[in-house]
Amino acid sequence: MAFKFKTFAAVGALIGSLALVGCGQDEKDPNHIKVGVIVGAEQQVAEVAQKVAKDKYGLDVELVTFNDYVLPNEALSKGDIDANAFQHKPYLDQQLKDRGYKLVAVGNTFVYPIAGYSKKIKSLDELQDGSQVAVPNDPTNLGRSLLLLQKVGLIKLKDGVGLLPTVLDVVENPKNLKIVELEAPQLPRSLDDAQIALAVINTTYASQIGLTPAKNGIFVEDKDSPYVNLIVTREDNKDAENVKKFVQAYQSDEVYEAANKVFNGGAVKGW
């Protein structure tokens, strides 16, 4: 038994050593990078960046997909990935404040306008008093949605609320709308809910069910939106060669053309 224990211990130590060596090599490899993206349309765009990175810069990009907005920053902070490309600055700022992450933006990608969608109405004139309106529940996209609802005249918010208003900041609601906060991935499905008259949905999730702002949105965020998406890394690897190569690959004409195709003209260049 003692012999077996020593053998297992030795093997375990060897495996641990190899794992550590592998991690060290991967972190220093300027020709490999792991990037977190949201599954769906943004993943398709990132796959074009992946090809450009390989063809132009000899960089192997390993895409790691996520289904929500929370895990990509957690994985990046833990070192499970080297970068992510999915969020805008207000969301990143809120994450840094709430979770204490040491993350930093290293490049812009696109503005993906949010829009109001419905399977019940075709214009805001048809929206009935007391209707339920679904919005994302994370603080930054909730604020973004409320600001858009204000812009189209459905509600009025307190003065000076900035980019992060909540439903508590609604001071006028002439149609007595009921604001329903949902997880962002649930919003496309909410359109089939008999109780939901309208949903404000991020382009990433809307595209998963074939909707685009320009074609299907009842109202759409302006193109001068401050919510440009970012490529984000940790502070300790922001100047790494693999990061620089990936940013160059993403900010290419090929990726811009791909984004416009995937989002049917709904992607606005942010660099």
Curated annotation (Swiss-Prot):
Region forming the signal peptide: 1-22
Q: Which CDD domains does the record associate with it?
A: PBP2_lipoprotein_IlpA_like
Q: Which GO BP annotation is one of this protein's? A: amino acid transport
Q: Which keywords label this protein? A: Amino-acid transport, Cell membrane, Lipoprotein, Membrane, Palmitate, Signal, Transport
This protein's major location comes to: membrane
Superkingdom, natural source? Bacteria
Localization (cell): Cell membrane
Q: Which GO terms describe its cellular component?
A: plasma membrane
At which residues does the record annotate a lipid attachment of kind N-palmitoyl cysteine?
Answer: C23
The UniProt similarity line reads: Belongs to the NlpA lipoprotein family.
What does this protein do, in the record's words? Answer: This protein is a component of a D-methionine permease, a binding protein-dependent, ATP-driven transport system.
Protein name per Swiss-Prot or TrEMBL = D-methionine-binding lipoprotein MetQ
Source species? Escherichia coli O157:H7
